[in-house]
C-alpha cells in the first residue's frame, strides 16, 4: 500500500516578470486553481495552498481549496513548506510534496511518482525528478537546472552551469551534445520527510545555495541525501513570463 502524502502548493503574489501570477486567468480559471485541480487528480490525501497574500487566499476559498495564509518573509519555498507542515500538525515521518504554484500543466502521475520514490528510499530525506537533455541550448541555459547522480540515483550536485563539463568534447565543439554523457534536467518537484524540514530551516542558506540560487544545495551541503528518478511523463514548462502564460492559454483552449 502506498504511503499517504500531502501536497502543498506555495503561491506568492509578487513576481518580477508576471505580477499576480497565481491569479492570472487561464481558460476561465485562475492559474492557482488549475494547479490545484491537477494536484487533486493525484493520490494525495490532502491538497493545501500556502500563500502570503490575502487576494490569493480569497480566490482559493472561492473555488473550495484548503488554503493557509503564511508569513511573507520566508527565504525559500521550502521554508514556507515547513511553516505549513507545522501548522497542519503533520507527523515527522509523514511525506509532503511541494508542487509549484506556476505549474498548471503538471501531470498528476509525477506527483504520485515523487511521493512513492521517497517512500521507497528510506535513506533519503528528499526525492525529486529529472529528464534527459536532448538539446545543447538547454545545457548552456542557466534557467535549465542540471543534476548529476551517483550509481544509486542519489544527487551528487545541481547546477545552472553545464554539468558535467565535458572538457575534451567542448574543446572541439560546443554546438552539439557530447556522446556518452547522460545530461539530465532537474524537474522542480520535491517530496520531503516532514521531520527534515525543521533542520532545513534551522540551517539557513549556505554560500553555494546563494551562488546558484538553488535551495536544494542547502540539503546537500549538510549531507542530506536526495533521490533523483527519471520522470515517467514529460513535464511541460511552467509559467514564468507573459509569453509562457499565452502558451499555456493556447494549450488549455483560451
Swiss-Prot record:
Keyword Nucleotide-binding part of the UniProt annotation: no
GO cellular component terms, semicolon-separated: cytosol
Pathway(s) per entry: Nucleotide-sugar biosynthesis; CMP-3-deoxy-D-manno-octulosonate biosynthesis; CMP-3-deoxy-D-manno-octulosonate from 3-deoxy-D-manno-octulosonate and CTP: step 1/1; Bacterial outer membrane biogenesis; lipopolysaccharide biosynthesis
GO biological process: CMP-keto-3-deoxy-D-manno-octulosonic acid biosynthetic process; lipopolysaccharide biosynthetic process
Enzyme Commission designation: 2.7.7.38
Catalytic activity: 3-deoxy-alpha-D-manno-oct-2-ulosonate + CTP = CMP-3-deoxy-beta-D-manno-octulosonate + diphosphate
UniProt entry tagged with the keyword Transferase: yes
GO molecular function, one term: 3-deoxy-manno-octulosonate cytidylyltransferase activity
Family listed: Belongs to the KdsB family.
Task performed by this protein: Activates KDO (a required 8-carbon sugar) for incorporation into bacterial lipopolysaccharide in Gram-negative bacteria.
The protein, known as: 3-deoxy-manno-octulosonate cytidylyltransferase
Organism encoding this protein: Pseudomonas aeruginosa (strain UCBPP-PA14)
Amino acid at each position: 500500500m502506498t504511503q499517504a502524502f500531502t501536497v502543498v502548493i506555495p503561491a506568492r503574489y509578487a513576481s518580477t516578470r508576471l505580477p499576480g501570477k497565481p491569479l492570472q486567468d487561464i481558460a476561465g480559471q485562475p492559474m492557482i486553481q488549475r494547479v490545484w485541480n491537477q494536484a487533486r487528480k493525484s493520490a494525495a490525501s490532502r491538497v493545501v495552498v500556502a500563500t502570503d497574500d490575502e487576494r490569493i487566499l480569497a480566490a482559493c476559498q472561492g473555488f473550495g481549496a484548503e488554503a493557509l495564509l503564511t508569513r511573507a518573509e520566508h527565504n525559500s519555498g521550502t521554508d514556507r513548506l515547513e511553516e505549513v507542515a507545522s501548522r497542519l500538525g503533520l507527523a515527522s515521518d509523514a511525506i509532503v510534496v511541494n508542487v509549484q504554484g506556476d505549474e498548471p500543466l503538471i501531470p498528476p502521475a509525477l506527483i504520485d511518482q515523487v511521493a512513492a520514490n521517497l517512500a521507497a528510499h528510506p535513506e533519503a530525506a528528499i526525492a525529486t525528478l529529472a529528464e534527459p537533455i536532448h538539446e545543447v541550448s538547454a545545457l548552456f541555459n542557466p534557467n535549465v537546472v542540471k543534476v548529476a547522480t551517483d550509481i544509486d540515483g542519489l544527487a551528487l550536485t545541481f547546477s545552472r552551469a553545464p554539468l558535467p563539463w565535458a572538457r575534451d568534447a567542448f574543446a572541439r565543439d560546443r554546438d552539439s551534445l557530447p556522446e556518452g554523457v547522460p545530461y539530465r534536467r532537474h524537474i522542480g518537484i520535491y517530496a520531503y520527510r516532514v521531520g527534515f524540514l525543521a533542520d532545513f530551516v534551522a540551517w539557513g542558506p549556505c554560500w553555494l545555495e546563494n551562488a546558484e540560487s538553488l535551495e536544494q544545495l542547502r540539503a546537500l551541503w549538510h549531507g542530506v541525501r536526495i533521490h533523483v528518478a527519471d520522470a515517467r511523463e514529460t513535464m511541460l514548462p511552467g509559467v514564468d513570463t507573459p509569453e509562457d502564460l499565452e502558451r499555456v492559454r493556447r494549450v488549455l483552449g483560451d
